[in-house]
Amino acid sequence: MITSTPVSVSILSAGYCLHPELLTLKGGTIKPVAFPAGYALLRHPQHGPILFDTGYSSRFFEETAKLPASLYRHITPVVFKEGESAVERLREAGIAPEEIRYMVLSHFHADHIGGVRDFPKAQFIYLRKSYEAVHRLGPIKALRAGFLPGLLPGDFTARSLPVDEYSPQRPLPPGFPFTEAYDLLGDG
């Protein structure tokens, strides 16, 4: 069974970056196309609102104000308007930042972790190997990996719940496009 607990899911975005089409589409051109910084709000009946990634926030521009990180915003220009961050959109929906108890991070690119610091009570669920791949990198290598360490809160490690350390892998039905699955909340 994939899930036994009904949850609602809202797919949202907080800004977008521009990148040449040919880097992601076979036969694409060099024209820049928008790639929305998507995130999801899951409403769980027992655990409350849960975020899957955050998209960008204005903090991205603070973190990329100086070299070498400023190269990031020139190589991959970001378009973000005040009022579209995850924290602001959730407030509009009546959800305070402190209500987010869990945040699932797919990986550590800036368009996925841009708003992480806006949620002071959230615990972070992620695959240990995805964090291990970036967190000790120097400034240039981190930049090449799309990782801006300043987007993470100072107490990130203390608030971390690496899923592969607390939850066993779950079997997947044949034909699934993923190789790993975990029951993040122990509810099926």
Task: Label each region the model flagged.
Residues 2-9, 44-49, 184-188:
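Beta-strand-turn-beta hairpins that frame and shape the catalytic cleft
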Residues 7, 16-88:
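Conserved beta-strand hairpin/beta-sheet module of binuclear metal-dependent hydrolase folds
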Residues 9, 42, 53, 100, ...:
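Divalent metal-coordination and catalytic microenvironments
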Residues 10-12, 50, 104, 125, ...:
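Hydrophobic/aromatic beta-strand patches that form the interior of the parallel beta-sheet core
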Residues 50, 59-62, 111-114, 133-135:
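Short catalytic/ligand-binding loop motif for oxyanion handling, primarily in non-cytosolic enzymes
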Residues 55-57, 109, 130:
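Catalytic metal-binding/acid-base residues of hydrolase active sites
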Residues 65-126:
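Active-site metal-binding motif and surrounding structural segment of the metallo-beta-lactamase
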Residues 78-95, 99, 129-188:
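Metallo-beta-lactamase
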